[in-house]
Curated annotation (Swiss-Prot):
Species, as recorded: Cavia porcellus (Guinea pig)
InterPro entries linked to this entry: 2Fe-2S-bd (IPR002888), 2Fe-2S-bd_dom_sf (IPR036884), 2Fe-2S_ferredoxin-like_sf (IPR036010), 2Fe-2S_ferredoxin-type (IPR001041), 2Fe2S_fd_BS (IPR006058), Ald_Oxase/Xan_DH_a/b (IPR000674), Ald_Oxase/Xan_DH_a/b_sf (IPR036856), Ald_Oxase/xanthine_DH-like (IPR016208)
Active site: E1268
Family the UniProt entry places it in: Belongs to the xanthine dehydrogenase family.
Full protein name: Aldehyde oxidase 4
Tagged with keyword Lyase: no
Gene: AOX4
Residue ranges of every copy of the FAD-binding PCMH-type domain listed in the record: 239-424
UniProt-annotated binding residues for Mo-molybdopterin: Q116, C154, A805, F806, L1046, G1087, S1088, M1089, G1090, Q1202, L1266
Key word Iron-sulfur present: yes
EC number assigned by the record: 1.2.3.1, 1.17.3.-
Main function: Aldehyde oxidase able to catalyze the oxidation of retinaldehyde into retinoate. Acts as a negative modulator of the epidermal trophism. May be able to oxidize a wide variety of aldehydes into their corresponding carboxylates and to hydroxylate azaheterocycles.
Residues spanning the membrane: none
Length: 1341
């Protein structure tokens, strides 16, 4: 650190208020400062690496040179506060508040039902708000683009986009291809005509309620900041922190002086590279130099032979500049510009593009850079400057590959980049393939250019650059040199492919894995470029240069990024229902406005408690090992550290029900908690945790995969089995028998709010109070009491809301709560325990990976006579929920099909991975995708459509399941029939077949899936529930129940129930929190039964109260509610009541293999249509139609939101979400960079959901639980992908080829799709002997 005297004041504005920081610390981010110093907790912490958008805020700056104010979104977790000098920051609190005025953006997000858990909502609001500040009348495409950097795990995005589209000047034209009237009107008529002719509705909200947007009412930019920006006497600023110094030069000479003095100091502009490297790679820099807003770095000149762009331009500004240039210049001059523009649309999200600069992007020379390969191919030059002078260097292969002779010298900076215009016979392209279309780093990207001799196809110059193939961007310079002078023809292409494979060869165990896929992508992307040039030549001279075959043109078309639209259809409320009765209405989430304003408080939003400490974890780095020693000396010596907590500090049990709180003597997985560090700040705790030294001695065996567990007979629980008929005998009397296996990998919950606990010890009676987000407060209470060795009545758990859960907060908060409580007990001080995203993913695990093996006997007609199934799940190292999950897998394994001879066996494997746990669908989504795989295989062998085989084998009449529970499948048949009809399945299937005949390199797939989903659990006492209702003397009602609000709208529905039962408006009813103090012994909120059981308890309590009030009401029937309550009090009538529901009487006898395991079933059907790019492995979901048996929906908006969100989450499970483990059991996917949940661009372009009405007498108001059912319907997407891939394989192999059983797996990632679409390029790829190398990652299913 330089020896400097004092620190300058940092001045910026937040929400119109001036902030002056006397001693700003360069290591403090804007997110931390907003939340901890300014107590603006609406801006959320979710990933810490700029990948999720939950911390989005708007930054505004005034440019003295252009005299303009620029508003742009940023991720506050990456913004150092020292970079904000002279800037204005707007957070969600500055946009609007329920205490003052809710902004139209916030209002519409809430009223369009765009919030569920609400954790991502402030970020969504800020992204749309910033867009409107720049474009008050945005296009739908701009709305979609603005949301591309924001992740949501709950809603499925559709309602969020819809809320943004309400601001568009020209509403999107209806694209549901129906003749005549608006699709909504026709859909309404058609829906009403089905079966019951009930009146169906399509409006989930009333847009006439929206307040108008008035841009003139937005806050003005602070005049003081304009004066600061225009100050002619600016000087260098110095900000001195605890460990680092921030230097902000005022002029270019000053910058060069600092660069010469501190040549190793990073230049900070957007901090999108340096920030994550500091946090995740442990880098440390004593000095930062930040040349923001220097005019010399912001030049833009498009005159002459090219474009000069200052290095200080953000990528968003670069995009704007290039769009302007492309619109003004002839197309042949803008080949490079258009290639860059194309990549800029999907590079990261809008927030990162607004922060990252061109200079930083060029100078870092990252292998995953999307722009550098294109810049290199376009012969870009870099203008460098230092104290010694100026020079220009080519941005070429030598520069990108890190050659010392071709890079920046000490003291130099990138001043600008010169992008030359292209010529008529020059062609430049940028190509990429990532795990998902937007906001994902490329697996492989490329920049390619060719300059042909004028008027010919002779190569004068060829440039090919690849990213993602090595540690740097690589140039195929040798191959390109050999091809100069050759003709641009098929022979040249073949030589180029062979040359590139020889020149750029990845080792088989290369970092990142996917070696064969990456090799294939090199050739596929080259082929796309080859075709593009061929077509361009044909357009220049059709006589001289023949066009490419028509069926090849699809290779040139990239999947468009459209704006999703669709319909939501549900049964209208009975017109005779009292107007104030809210049941059946699409009521807004009771906390929706608070979500949108950031005023809904989550655990980490709670104010700091006096003497509070922060907890950081030390986790095992070995999968199975003895702990030899734990050295805490260096950690304890660090400033701010109060204690290191180990197993020795646990007062009670350290191992409860097989779950270990702190590792003791040995570790059984990578990620197991060994110890924790408590310190005065999280930064100090985290630093100290990194200093704890743990010595291990490995233990064999180390079991990571299911296959390894089977080899060692390593299981967590006994086998479960159900069987009907005579399976072995039936196999002898069928036309054909096929066998296969399907691997289904796991899934990360990726709830937006990571596991968070605030544990507060009380001074007397050994009490402990915990605030946390959980689905099971009783379980937390049990584990904490056990760990502290106190009765449960000393432990109070408070749960107001969780920022998403999906099963991940059923058991894991109990273990983590015990860990935090032990720390609070040892230190005697409150403990705040917030897991970072990477630690959360590592420690808490997720959905069980599954291996399914099937044997199916069937007739030539497609009728299945016998099925024998074996399922194995990877349970991890401790029991957790694995036994219950495998029981669900077995019980649900038939899905919607009647197989007369059916056997299913299942077992949970014990491995050295973190214990997998409950996840939405609870085993059903993994197991039944295996069922659909064998349905598809049977169809292939019978030359039938899979849908024909599904319908043939579906339950058709009142029946009993394989475990002897009776049910009526009539709603299943109705959902199937309606979906078949209203999705126009057969017409679209014929259209897809026509498309596939005319398109070689893109294939269209269509699939329709039925579903019979179970609700609840086979254990009766898990269905009991209780509620507590107080009526106060002013007539207001306080409602409490045992269910947890996770975003699923449970509290909203409970208020609707109470409103109906008490006959009062919901505005009279308040629901605060779930607590073990008010409702004891509550069961978990899971299994889609939250409304079923808690609704019954609330109903019971309200009916008890109304029975007490009846004498008062009878005497004054026309009186008001308040009068009745006052009179009841005067008559000493109790105005408080508990409600209780004993539960559904379910049971399952595993010895007899029979039982009434579930209270009822939910039925549904979904149809999905996808396009697949056979060359890259990308896919595009074109349309999804969902028909869900909702019986009577208490709240159609909530239920449709649950269905859409579950469908998109299921789609993620089956496509983009891929967990990767090292062979030694280390999770490699630990953040937004490595794990890709769907974004707004992945959801269907057309998204139609219909709630089908039926009856369900066992549940409250004849409703059904719909929280999980939609998850499996996402499998319609993977089935459609299988259909498209099968079409590609059939075309390659020939129409007369023998039917095959496609070796399917889940997820169907770009890698699987591409390698399954075998062609001449996959045939060229060398295959390495697996026994000769250690792979970078492995499948654990």
């Amino acid at each position: 650190m330089p020896s400097l005297s004092g620190s300058d004041e940092l001045i910026f504005f937040v929400n119109g208020k001036k902030v002056v920081v006397k001693k700003p610390d360069p290591e403090v981010t804007l997110l931390f400062y907003l939340r901890r110093e300014l107590h603006l907790t609406g801006t959320k912490f979710a990933c810490g690496e700029g990948g999720c958008g939950a911390c989005t805020v708007m930054v505004s700056r005034y440019s003295a040179s252009s005299k303009q104010i620029r508003h742009y979104p940023v991720t506050a977790c990456l913004v150092p506060i020292c970079s904000l000098h002279g800037a204005a920051v707007t957070t969600v609190e500055g946009v609007g508040s329920i205490r003052t005025r809710v902004h139209p953006v916030q209002e519409r997000l809430a009223k369009c039902h765009g919030t569920q858990c609400g954790f991502c909502s402030p970020g969504m609001v800020m992204s749309i708000y910033t867009l409107l500040r720049n474009h008050p009348d945005p296009t739908p495409e701009q709305v979609t683009e603005a949301l591309g950097g924001n992740l949501c795990r709950c809603t499925g995005y559709r309602p969020i986009v819809e809320s943004g589209k309400t601001f568009c000047a020209n509403p999107t034209v209806c694209q549901v291809k129906r003749p005549g009237r608006c699709c909504l009107e026709q859909e309404e008529e058609e829906a009403g005509s089905v079966h019951t002719r009930e009146k169906m509705c399509t409006k989930l909200y009333d847009k006439d309620e929206f307040q108008p947007l008035d841009p003139s009412q937005e806050p003005i930019f602070p005049p003081e900041l304009i004066r600061m920006a225009e100050d002619p006497n600016k000087r260098r600023l110095t900000f001195q922190g605890e460990r680092t110094t921030w230097l902000a030069p005022a002029t270019l000479p000053d910058l060069l002086e600092l660069r010469a003095e501190f040549p190793q100091a990073p230049l900070i502009m957007g901090n999108t590279t340096v920030g994550p490297d500091i946090k995740f790679k442990g880098e440390f820099h004593p000095v930062f130099v930040s040349p923001l807003e220097l005019p010399e770095l912001c030049v833009l000149n498009s005159e002459g032979d090219g474009v000069t762009v200052g290095s200080g331009h953000s990528l968003a500004q670069l995009s704007d500049a290039l769009q302007s240039i492309v619109s003004q210049q002839p197309s042949e001059r803008t080949e490079t510009c258009r290639a860059l523009l194309n990549h800029l649309r999907t590079l990261a999200g809008v927030q990162i593009r607004s922060m990252a600069t061109l200079g930083g992007h060029v100078a870092t020379r990252a292998t995953v850079s999307d722009l550098n390969p294109i810049l290199a191919a376009g012969k870009t030059t870099i203008h460098l400057v230092s104290k010694e002078g100026e020079r220009q260097i080519p941005l070429d292969g030598a520069f990108l590959e890190g050659s010392p002779r071709a890079g920046l010298r000490p003291g130099e900076i990138v001043l600008s980049v010169f992008i030359p215009y292209s010529s008529q016979w020059q062609f430049v392209s940028g190509l990429r393939q990532a795990q998902r279309q937007e906001n994902a780093m490329a697996i492989v990207n490329a920049g390619m250019s060719v300059r042909l001799e004028d008027g010919s196809s002779t190569i004068r110059d060829l440039q090919v650059f690849y990213g993602g193939i090595g540690p740097t961007v690589l140039s195929a310079s040798r191959t390109c040199g050999q091809l100069v002078g050759r003709q641009w023809d098929d022979q040249m292409l073949g030589e180029a492919c062979r040359g590139i494979l020889d020149e750029l060869r990845l080792p088989p165990g290369a970092k990142g894995g996917q070696v064969e896929f990456r090799h294939t992508l090199m050739l596929s992307l080259l082929f796309k470029f080859y075709l593009r040039v061929q077509r361009a030549l044909s357009k220049l001279d059709p006589q001289k240069f023949p066009d490419i075959p028509e069926e090849y043109t699809s290779a040139l078309e990239e999947f468009p990024i459209g704006t999703p639209q669709g319909t939501q259809i549900f049964r209208c409320v009975d017109p005779h229902q009292p107007p104030q009765d809210p049941v059946g209405h699409p009521v807004m989430h009771q906390a929706g406005l608070k979500h949108a304003t950031g005023e809904a408080a989550f655990v980490d939003d709670l104010p700091l408690v006096s003497q509070e400490l922060f907890l950081a974890v030390v986790t095992s780095t070995r999968a199975h090992a003895k702990i030899i020693s734990i050295d805490t000396g260096e950690a304890l010596a660090l400033p701010g550290v109060v204690a290191v907590i180990t197993a020795e500090d646990v007062p009670g049990e350290n191992n409860h029900q097989g779950e270990i709180f702190y590792a003791q003597r040995e570790v059984v997985c990578v990620g197991q908690i060994v110890c924790t560090v408590a310190a005065d700040t999280y930064a100090h705790a985290r630093e100290a945790a990194q200093k704890v030294k743990v010595e291990y001695e490995d233990i064999e065996p180390r079991i990571i995969t299911i296959e390894q567990a089977l080899e060692h007979s390593s299981f967590l629980s006994p086998e479960r089995k159900i069987e009907q008929g005579n399976v072995e005998q039936a196999f002898k009397h069928v036309d054909q028998v096929i066998e296969g296996e399907v691997h289904v990998e796991g899934q990360e919950h990726f709830y937006m709010e990571t596991q968070t606990i605030l544990a507060v010890p009380r001074a007397e009676d050994k009490e402990m109070v915990l605030h946390l987000g959980t689905q099971f407060p009783t379980h937390v209470q049990e584990f904490v009491a056990t760990a502290l060795n106190v009765p449960r009545n000393r432990i109070a758990c408070h749960m107001r809301r969780a920022g998403g859960a999906f099963g991940g907060k059923v058991t894991k908060p109990a273990l983590l709560g015990a860990v935090a409580a032990v720390a609070a007990k040892k230190t005697g001080r409150p403990i705040r325990f917030v897991l970072e995203r990477g630690d959360d993913m590592l420690i808490t695990a997720g959905r069980h990976p599954l291996l399914g093996r099937y044997k199916v006997g069937f007739m030539k007609s497609g009728l299945i006579k016998a099925v024998d199934l074996e399922f194995y799940i990877n349970g991890g190292c401790t029991p957790d929920e694995s036994q219950l999950v495998i029981e669900y897998v077995v019980l649900k394994s038939e899905n919607a099909y009647y197989i007369p001879n059916f056997r299913c066996r299942g077992r949970a494997c014990k491995t050295n991975l973190p214990s997998n746990t409950a996840f939405r669908g609870f085993g059903f989504p993994q197991a039944t995708v295996v069922v659909e795989a064998y349905m598809t295989a049977v169809a292939s062998h019978c030359d039938l459509l899979p849908e024909e085989v599904r319908e043939m084998n579906m339950y058709k009449r009142p029946s009993q399941t394989a475990y002897r529970q009776r049910f009526d499948p009539e709603p299943l048949r109705r959902c199937w029939k309606d979906c078949l009809e209203h999705s126009s399945f057969h017409a679209r299937k014929r259209a897809a077949e026509d498309f596939n005949r005319q398109s070689r390199w893109k294939k269209r797939g269509l699939a329709m899936i039925p579903m019979k989903y179970t609700i609840g659990v086979p254990v009766a006492y898990y269905h009991q529930a209780a509620a507590l209702v107080h009526i106060y003397l002013d007539g207001s009602v306080l409602l409490t129940h045992g269910g947890c609000e996770l975003g699923q709208g449970l509290h909203t529905k409970m208020m609707q129930v109470a409103s109906r039962e008490l006959g009062i408006p919901t505005s009279y009813i308040h629901l605060s929190e779930t607590s073990t103090v008010t409702v004891p012994n509550a069961v978990f909120t899971a299994g889609s039964m939250g409304t079923d059981i808690n609704g019954k308890a609330v109903q019971n309590a309200c009916q008890t109260l109304m029975a007490r009030l009846q004498p008062v009401i009878r005497r004054n029937p026309k009186g008001k509610w308040e009068e009745w309550i006052k009179k009841a009090f005067e008559e000493s009538i109790s105005l408080s009541a508990t409600g209780y529901f004993r539960g559904f009487q379910t049971n399952m006898d595993w010895d007899k293999e029979r039982g009434d395991a579930f209270p009822y079933y939910v039925y549904g059907a979904a149809c999905a249509e996808v396009d697949v790019d056979c060359l890259s492995g990308a896919h595009k979901l074109l349309r999804a139609d969902i028909f869900m048996d909702a019986a009577f929906s208490i709240n159609p908006a909530v239920d449709i939101g649950q269905i859409e969100g579950a469908f998109v989450q299921g789609m993620g499970l089956y496509t983009t979400e891929e967990l990767k483990y090292s062979p030694k059991g280390k999770l490699r996917s630990q953040g937004t960079n490595d794990y890709k949940i769907p974004t707004v661009t992945e959801i269907p372009e057309e998204f139609h959901v219909t709630l089908v009405h039926s009856r369900n007498p066992v549940a409250i108001y004849s409703s059904k639980g719909l929280g999980e059912a939609g998850m499996f319907l996402g499998s319609s997407v993977i089935s459609a992908i299988w259909d498209a891939v099968a079409a590609a394989r059939k075309e390659r192999k020939g129409a007369e080829s023998v039917p095959e059983t496609l070796a399917v797996r889940s997820p169907a990632t770009p890698e699987w799709i591409r390698m399954a679409c075998v062609d001449q390029f996959t045939d060229m790829i060398p295959r390495d002997d697996p026994s000769t190398f250690t792979p970078w990652s492995i499948c654990v299913s």
